[in-house]
From Swiss-Prot:
Chaperone keyword on record: no
Membrane topology (UniProt): Multi-pass membrane protein
Annotated GO MF terms: C-C chemokine binding; C-C chemokine receptor activity; interleukin-8 binding; interleukin-8 receptor activity
Compartment(s) where it occurs, according to its Swiss-Prot or TrEMBL record: Cell membrane
Pfam families: 7tm_1 (PF00001)
Organism encoding this protein: Macaca mulatta (Rhesus macaque)
Cytoplasmic side: 68-76, 134-154, 226-243, 311-351
Official protein name in the record: C-X-C chemokine receptor type 1
Length: 351
């Protein structure tokens, strides 16, 4: 997702570019942003916290899944790739945080590489969430093992998600460069010549469609039918499974839908499809800062939603601790018995 707040300005008197669109002589207007400094430091602290939490949580998820070589499920393969996507996404946050202080000082090459890495892992994460919803839909609604549920096919699906993510992200790698507007600090920005605003609209609409809207519709469709099936079926602990599924969709919506809506409003304003004013630019700039924080938070919430709630993850983590003598094997055995008697049909245990 094109991060409209990546190119942050310094402590200049005027806000030239806080929504990521360097001003031109035609559309420049001296809009002041009263909360610039406050927003800057709030975002830096948030990036640091998300980076640390995501690094810890997703590393643990990868450790547990890779440690469990026998009995690794289809969902585990998706979760492993999702953890990799979130972890790689989080690794770009320190660089973006540093750019909040003095602008983009890292040059064009790093601008391209870090932007590509950030975009690829954002989109791969969302596409993998959609794949998990399809996997749960097939397992619960159709209760059958289709080709997509075979391990080699799942690996192909994951590779396809990464490949599509690279394709969606290529424009940012090709067109982004270090850019130094007049009377302002340098930014990492897509430079497309005289038609920059028009092409930026295209660069936003295509990823919005294929990297957000379509995966979201797939998730809503699959989880909708999955919940309907669980309501009709007489399955033990089905309410627990429903809580996990609700968390999947609701957390995703809470984290990314607000940012995408505000980003759409910013694009419409910058292309003059809605009226532009200093007040509106300030409002959208503050909204982008706030909603971007929610979106970035999603990368460290995934381990909680998809792993820490699940019985299998907790048992796998305790098994690693027991192997290294950090917990007793008796405690591990008691936990395994409790997990087995309280879990339902793979619906919630995998999640």
């Amino acid at each position: 997702m094109s991060n409209a707040t990546d190119p942050q300005m310094g402590d200049d008197d005027y806000d030239l570019n806080f929504t990521g669109m360097p001003p031109t002589d035609e559309d420049y207007s001296p809009c002041r942003l009263e909360t610039q400094s406050l927003n800057k430091y709030v975002v830096i602290v948030t990036y640091a916290l998300v980076f640390l939490l995501s690094l810890l949580g997703n590393s643990l998820v990868m450790l547990v899944i890779l440690y469990r070589r026998v009995g690794r499920s289809v969902t585990d393969v998706y979760l492993l790739n999702l953890a990799m996507a979130d972890l790689l996404f989080a690794l770009t946050l320190p660089i973006w945080a540093a750019s909040k202080v003095n602008g983009w000082i890292f040059g064009t090459f790093l601008c391209k590489v870090v932007s590509l890495l950030k975009e690829v892992n954002f989109y791969s994460g969302i596409l993998l969430l959609a794949c998990i919803s399809v996997d749960r839909y097939l397992a619960i609604v159709h209760a059958t093992r289709t080709l997509i549920q075979k391990r080699h096919s799942v690996k192909f699906v994951c590779l396809s998600c990464w490949g599509l993510s690279v394709i969606l992200s290529l424009p940012f790698f090709l067109f982004r460069q270090a850019y130094h507007p007049n009377n302002s600090t340098p930014v990492c920005y897509e430079v497309l010549g005289n038609d920059t605003a028009k092409w930026r609209m295209v660069l936003r609409i295509l990823p919005h469609t294929f990297g957000f809207t379509l995966p979201l519709l797939i998730m809503l469709f699959c989880y909708g039918f999955t919940l309907h099936t669980l309501f009709k079926a007489h399955i033990g602990q089905k309410h627990r499974a429903m809580r996990v599924i609700f968390a999947v969709v609701l957390i995703f919506l809470l984290c990314w839908l607000p940012y995408n809506l505000v980003l759409l409003a910013d694009t419409l304003m910058r292309t003059h499809l809605i009226k532009e004013s200093c007040e509106r630019r300030n409002d959208i700039g503050r909204a982008l800062d706030a909603t971007e924080i929610l979106g970035f938070l999603h990368s460290c919430l995934n381990p909680i939603i998809y792993a820490f709630i699940g019985q299998n993850f907790r048992h796998g983590f305790l098994k690693i601790l027991a192997t290294h003598g950090l917990v007793s094997k008796e405690f591990l055995a008691r936990h395994h018995v409790t997990s087995y008697t309280s879990s339902s049909v793979n619906v919630s245990s995998n999640l």
